[in-house]
Regions:
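Alpha-helical recognition/docking segments in bacterial nutrient-uptake
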Residues: 1-109
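Short, basic, alpha-helical segments at the C-terminal edge of helix-turn-helix-like DNA-binding modules
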Residues: 356-372
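Hydrophobic alpha-helical
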Residues: 25, 40-79, 107, 111, ...
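Short alpha-helical "packing" element that flanks the helix-turn-helix/winged-helix DNA-binding module
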Residues: 316-323, 350
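Regulatory hinge/linker segments at domain boundaries
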Residues: 273, 293-315
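Hydrophobic alpha-helical segments within soluble ligand-binding/sensing domains
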Residues: 1, 85, 91-121, 157-162, ...
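Recognition helix of helix-turn-helix DNA-binding domains
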Residues: 326-361
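Flexible loop/turn connectors
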Residues: 18-20, 24-29, 90-93, 169-170, ...
Length: 387
């Protein structure tokens, strides 16, 4: 009855730090309810030898679709985290993920409790099914939202910001497709109109590492890890019990909001707080064209910073903190109780991943988006998280 967790260095996508922590927590279930084993891409076919095998994919876009199809051919149930099966009707897999309308309800309840009713949806990628479903779910729930309140990313983030800027005073809350867009917006608005951010709500999505470490921490829509673990355990148990009769299950994670500085730490409303009236089914007009965030010079730079942070272990995050604080190499090594050779090893790895040749360039690379105070708090909070 093992749960096989795909863990392969050949995965095409760097898993976020949060996802890697979740995988560690899932493996810890081995001591309680679910025996778990890591498995590589080359070993997928061997799972057929276990009549009770279930494969867990930590991220849909990290693996080829052929892996899911191969498991389907061999009657091996597949669970995918954070990707609804309805997004890929040609594939059969179970999912444990959030739901766009649940997220929309939580966001609108939060904004309404704070008296923020004039909403804008910013930097929603026209070619992203996730962005489109999230934006439409908000439009379905919000009373006053109109198609012109959607500022979709068509050609570049800067162009989207330029379209938004003349209308900025019309809104008291801006909801973003992800934390990267929220961070880019804060940076651009601080340069263009520093007083604008005070009193307004800016809410991202996905709870990235940068949302906690940026100079202005970003409130984000997310979920609780305990709900994810409960969801995986429930789906796994059901697939084993009804193996052969169940093709796929969809477990919906309850929405949660991580409240941070971009909403001035405004407290969450009571669960019983009423929602705004339904907006019916306002159809948002996404432009035909679109671009990928990775290709945008602004969003791509922020995503690259996130990737670099996710690739760092705890020692390297501590080294980064000391460097951002202006400490010398000698002081850094002494403070972390590591040798000069160990410090050199880690810094070379960090420089190579960041594509820089020296310490000062490395510091400039991260100082733009990482607050030493917030990194200190993160390291303290996650002292036992294995990061």
């Amino acid at each position: 009855m093992a749960l096989y967790i795909l863990d392969d260095p050949g995965l095409s996508v760097q898993l976020p730090a949060k996802t890697r922590t979740e995988i560690g927590a899932l493996r810890a279930l081995n001591r309680h309810r679910i025996p778990s084993r890591p498995v590589g891409l080359a070993d997928i076919d061997t799972l057929a030898e276990d009549p009770q095998a279930v494969l867990l994919l930590p991220q849909f876009h990290a693996v080829p679709e052929a892996v899911i199809r191969r498991c389907e051919q061999q009657a091996i149930p597949v669970i995918v985290l954070h990707t609804p099966g309805s997004s890929f009707p040609a594939l059969h897999f179970s999912s444990v993920c959030g739901h766009a309308h649940s997220d929309a309800d939580a966001l609108l309840r939060y904004c309404a409790a704070a008296g923020r009713q004039r909403l804008a949806l910013f930097a929603f990628n026209a070619v992203s099914a996730v962005d489109r479903s999230r934006a439409q779910a908000i439009a379905d729930r919000a009373t006053a939202l109109q198609p012109e309140d959607l500022f979709a990313a068509v050609d570049s983030f800067e162009a989207s910001f330029a379209r938004f800027y003349p209308h900025r005073q019309q809104y008291d809350a801006i909801l973003f497709a992800n934390d990267y867009a929220a961070i880019a917006f804060i940076e651009a608005m601080q340069a263009a109109d520093p007083t604008y951010l005070a009193g307004r709500f800016l809410i991202g999505a996905a709870d990235t590492l940068l949302s906690r470490l940026y100079h202005t921490t970003v409130t984000t829509i997310t979920y609780h890890r305990r709900d994810l673990l409960r969801g995986v355990a429930t789906v796994h148990r059901t697939l084993l019990r009804d193996r052969g009769s169940v093709v796929s299950l969809q477990y919906q994670l309850p929405a949660a909001i991580a409240v941070r500085q971009s909403t001035q730490h405004f407290p969450l409303p009571p669960e019983a707080a009423p929602l705004p009236g339904s907006g019916g089914s306002t159809r948002l007009r996404f432009p035909e064209q679109g671009f990928f965030y990775e290709q945008d010079p602004v969003l791509g730079r922020i995503m690259a910073t996130e990737d670099q942070l996710c690739a760092m272990d705890r020692t390297e995050l501590q080294i980064l903190l000391h460097f951002l604080q202006g400490d010398t190499n000698r002081h850094t090594a002494e403070a972390l109780y590591i040798s000069d050779q160990a410090l050199l090893y880690h810094t070379r790895r960090m420089f190579r991943r960041a594509g820089v040749a020296d310490k000062q360039t490395f510091i400039r690379f991260f100082a733009r988006y990482v607050s030493p105070a917030h990194l200190t708090a993160y390291l303290h909070t996650h002292a036992c998280a294995g990061i």
